[in-house]
Amino acid sequence: MKYVCLRSFIKILEKHKKIKRIFVPISPNLEITEISHRTINKEGPALIFENPKGYKMPLLCNLFGTTERVAMAMGGKDIKYIRKLGKIISFLKTPEAPKNIKDILNIAPKFKAMLHMFTKKVNNAPCQEEIFSGSDVDLTSIPIMKCWPNDIGPLITWGLTITKGPYKKRQNIGVYRQQVIEKNKIIMRWLPHRGGALDFLSWKNSKKAYEDKFPVAIALGADPATILSAVTPIPDNLSEYSFAGLLRKNKTEVIKCISSDLEVPAYSEIILEGYLDDKIAEEGPYGDHTGYYNEIERFPILNITHITKRKDSLYHSTYTGKPIDEPSVIGMALNELFIPILQKQFPEIIDFYLPPECCSYRISVVSIKKQYLGHANQIMMGIWSILRQFMYTKFIIVCDDDIDIRNWKDIMWSISTRVDPYRDTLLIKNTPIDYLDFASEKKNLGSKIGIDATNKWPGETTRNWGVPIKMDKIIKDKIDLIWDDLNIF
């Protein structure tokens, strides 16, 4: 599915009747959250609020509210397409030389797709059609949402934060929430291990910290492919802009900022330009994807020097809360992306599942074709290590390939019948944990547990292992033939 920018993607959604324009005045203060929450829980359309109360700028919400729309944003039609993308990412991470003609034919489409991965630098761009600086910089002109009753204030949620470390060749793009504290100041909430925070730390430890200020740009209303690229486990040597071009089948056009050399998506609706210094402020509390309000913490203040916009710009926002919300829907879609990456490293993996009700990543379930003693433990350690996204996974449940890991009833049966709590659990202390996980004993440091719910082999148990009950196939087929005639239901 080919498109250029957010506006052209909205036209695609309109063509397929997957977006709704709401002309009734609705307040960005709590009301849009409630409407979006009800809509997403019924797998409803994306929403454009044409008249947010008190604002002239429309507000887009619930863009990624179904896995189908996530797939469309990534260039496909449905979630099956995302599995194919996972194979491309797996190839890009660890490319292999072709061994025969069949391998060459299989690789060719991948290289064809890569032709869109080169960025195109432009001198004029829609995102700079209107430029505001100095006293004209005013975030209060944007319908930034306050999502939950106890939130401290308005919160920017879908901004793509663009940074570059002093010794890096390419930029980093991350999605971090930002609290508005003044008309030209926001708090940059990023965790220490995230790319933007690492760039800032590197800058503070460099000579440049004494010579200049650390530039930051935030793209609001970027094209959906670039947004999703910022939350996708792409190879470290591949830029988000390049991967976005692959997704939307169009090269990403970028333009240099007004106030710095940072390059931003040319078709973004709004760009915030500014700088960080050593000033910090208390951030929060805010309702988060866990379904709870987070603690108040101190983070850097971003001073905004310029706002550039498209004419008739649109503000793109979301809310986060107890699943189901947009992050959990994106997590469901990206789950399909992870599977080929994991299978490339561990071919014995049959399926992998991140239940959306578990805050996207805190519990994972995997099914394997068991091959040797202790196999489940090896898989646990591998999953915790292979991708940064799984660093915060607290629970890993490993099942045999006869278990449908997308079905909690099957999982619970497997745990209740194949697990001895002492023998089949792997506990690890003092591991990285999500800063928002207040259940951990310490901030950023907690424990993990792996549960081996596979059938145990001789050497893993001294007892005779149970044989699962199954009906004969002949009988099942016979009853299938007469089932409708029985009129039981």
Curated annotation (Swiss-Prot):
<dbReference type="GO" id="GO:0008694">
    <property type="term" value="F:3-octaprenyl-4-hydroxybenzoate carboxy-lyase activity"/>
</dbReference>
<protein>
    <recommendedName>
        <fullName>3-octaprenyl-4-hydroxybenzoate carboxy-lyase</fullName>
        <ecNumber>4.1.1.98</ecNumber>
    </recommendedName>
</protein>
<feature type="active site" description="Proton donor">
    <location>
        <position position="288"/>
    </location>
</feature>
<keyword id="KW-0285">Flavoprotein</keyword>
<dbReference type="InterPro" id="IPR002830">
    <property type="entry name" value="UbiD"/>
</dbReference>
<comment type="function">
    <text>Catalyzes the decarboxylation of 3-octaprenyl-4-hydroxy benzoate to 2-octaprenylphenol, an intermediate step in ubiquinone biosynthesis.</text>
</comment>
<feature type="binding site">
    <location>
        <begin position="194"/>
        <end position="195"/>
    </location>
    <ligand>
        <name>prenylated FMN</name>
    </ligand>
</feature>
<dbReference type="InterPro" id="IPR049383">
    <property type="entry name" value="UbiD-like_N"/>
</dbReference>
<dbReference type="GO" id="GO:0046872">
    <property type="term" value="F:metal ion binding"/>
</dbReference>
<dbReference type="GO" id="GO:0006744">
    <property type="term" value="P:ubiquinone biosynthetic process"/>
</dbReference>
<feature type="binding site">
    <location>
        <position position="240"/>
    </location>
    <ligand>
        <name>Mn(2+)</name>
    </ligand>
</feature>
<dbReference type="Pfam" id="PF20695">
    <property type="entry name" value="UbiD_N"/>
</dbReference>
<keyword id="KW-1003">Cell membrane</keyword>
<dbReference type="GO" id="GO:0005886">
    <property type="term" value="C:plasma membrane"/>
</dbReference>
<comment type="subunit">
    <text>Homohexamer.</text>
</comment>
<dbReference type="InterPro" id="IPR023677">
    <property type="entry name" value="UbiD_bacteria"/>
</dbReference>
<dbReference type="InterPro" id="IPR049381">
    <property type="entry name" value="UbiD-like_C"/>
</dbReference>
<keyword id="KW-0479">Metal-binding</keyword>
<dbReference type="InterPro" id="IPR048304">
    <property type="entry name" value="UbiD_Rift_dom"/>
</dbReference>
<keyword id="KW-0288">FMN</keyword>
<feature type="binding site">
    <location>
        <begin position="175"/>
        <end position="177"/>
    </location>
    <ligand>
        <name>prenylated FMN</name>
    </ligand>
</feature>
<feature type="binding site">
    <location>
        <position position="172"/>
    </location>
    <ligand>
        <name>Mn(2+)</name>
    </ligand>
</feature>
<feature type="binding site">
    <location>
        <begin position="189"/>
        <end position="191"/>
    </location>
    <ligand>
        <name>prenylated FMN</name>
    </ligand>
</feature>
<keyword id="KW-0456">Lyase</keyword>
<dbReference type="Pfam" id="PF01977">
    <property type="entry name" value="UbiD"/>
</dbReference>
<comment type="pathway">
    <text>Cofactor biosynthesis; ubiquinone biosynthesis.</text>
</comment>
<keyword id="KW-0472">Membrane</keyword>
<dbReference type="Pfam" id="PF20696">
    <property type="entry name" value="UbiD_C"/>
</dbReference>
<keyword id="KW-0831">Ubiquinone biosynthesis</keyword>
<keyword id="KW-0464">Manganese</keyword>
<dbReference type="GO" id="GO:0005829">
    <property type="term" value="C:cytosol"/>
</dbReference>
<keyword id="KW-0210">Decarboxylase</keyword>
<comment type="similarity">
    <text>Belongs to the UbiD family.</text>
</comment>
